[in-house]
Amino acid sequence: MGSTDQAVTSVRRSAQLFTDACAVIPGGVNSPVRAFTAVGGTPRFITEAHGCWLTDADGNRYADLVCSWGPMILGHAHPAVVEAVSRAAANGLSFGAPTPTETELAAEMIGRVAPVERLRLVNSGTEATMSAVRLARGFTGRSKIIKFSGCYHGHVDALLADAGSGVATLGLPSSPGVTGAAAADTIVLPYNDLEAVRQTFAQHGEQIAAVITEASPGNMGVVPPGRGYNAALRAVTAEHGALLIVDEVMTGFRVSRSGWYGIDPVDADLFTFGKVMSGGLPAAAFGGRAEVMERLAPLGPVYQAGTLSGNPVAMAAGLATLRTADDGVYAALDANADRLARLLAGALTDAGVAHQIPRAGNMLSVFFSETPVTDFAAARNSQTWRFAPFFHALLDAGVYPPCSAFEAWFVSAALDDTAFERIADALPTAARAAANATPESRP
């Protein structure tokens, strides 16, 4: 396809599908950000995807810069993954028993992240972080957890406080239904502030079971850790007998073959994984030092279980994705992110729009800000009202960016020259829309 057929001509079918969905699903979606709450307008109902292209229910095609919020590093419907999934499904969808494939996937992941000696497979990133926190408490005999403002670790009660992702998108401080008791043992500190961490350990060190942090946050937008930040967290936790939990649900096996660990090799006690590791199907994992992981049932007293954990079809998708993602794939991911960042910066500069484009490997974000964004407060203080007009100008031109200023942009290795032509054609209009926006432009 060429750049001449790029305009989105109608969203009538998506609008009807959204109306139908709202009649049976709260808000019409099964994850809040998909409702376009932050940007307004009609959510696109996607019916198929191949390579770097999405097709909606009205037949419009979009160059995909979301990649299912990260997992699709190879692009959509990659032949190797489709074949592996088809073969696995033909042998049965779920057994409720151990399978060879789950051991293969665990071994593949352990081979890439040196501190991970044992791995437990689960069904979602939320399960992974919830279980890692429980395990840290069970291992240390302590109750308090430190998390950071803007870091999102799933929707488990104890970790929703001042979270990023959809919580930031909707402007919620936490969530109704999270009781004071559930959050009482969660200490929330500003991100990238080591002095706050040290002071908190000085006051509460003997009560702190763990610090949990995104390896490089992407759920308040991409806000990378300061140089040496994760290593300093490792040192402080080790000094006080607490565990360090590094959440690589987003970065794991995306930003490098070994995830963020391959860029910043800090030996955390526990890691969490998701997204890429299962190739777009529902699965996640947590793992770490054998001494800690062997406190899990059935070896130890810390209970964790799941009927569908280690699902053979998801395991097959994950193995195929990881084994197909060779050095050439990671080089393409980095090159595509570089190319996208240059196009974004060029268009916004030409339009006179102050901006920051922070990077975490091949993940990036766009903040409308004159100064660097280093924490959640700075992200929220950026000119987020410019984002909705920017987003819709891209969407109307057949480019599918993230529908929130507080989410990461993702590229796939399949992003091709035709897609980049479309993006380049769309960006000047989108940048002008951002330039002309006012605070009243908010949806």
Swiss-Prot record:
Its EC number is 5.4.3.8. Its cofactor is pyridoxal 5'-phosphate. Keywords: Cytoplasm, Isomerase, Porphyrin biosynthesis, Pyridoxal phosphate. The keyword Cytoplasm applies. It catalyses: (S)-4-amino-5-oxopentanoate = 5-aminolevulinate. The keyword Transmembrane helix does not apply. One of its GO terms (molecular function) is transaminase activity. The modification N6-(pyridoxal phosphate)lysine is found at K275. One of its GO terms (cellular component) is cytoplasm. It is found in: Cytoplasm. GO terms for biological process: protoporphyrinogen IX biosynthetic process. Pathway: Porphyrin-containing compound metabolism; protoporphyrin-IX biosynthesis; 5-aminolevulinate from L-glutamyl-tRNA(Glu): step 2/2. Homodimer. Belongs to the class-III pyridoxal-phosphate-dependent aminotransferase family. HemL subfamily. This is Glutamate-1-semialdehyde 2,1-aminomutase.
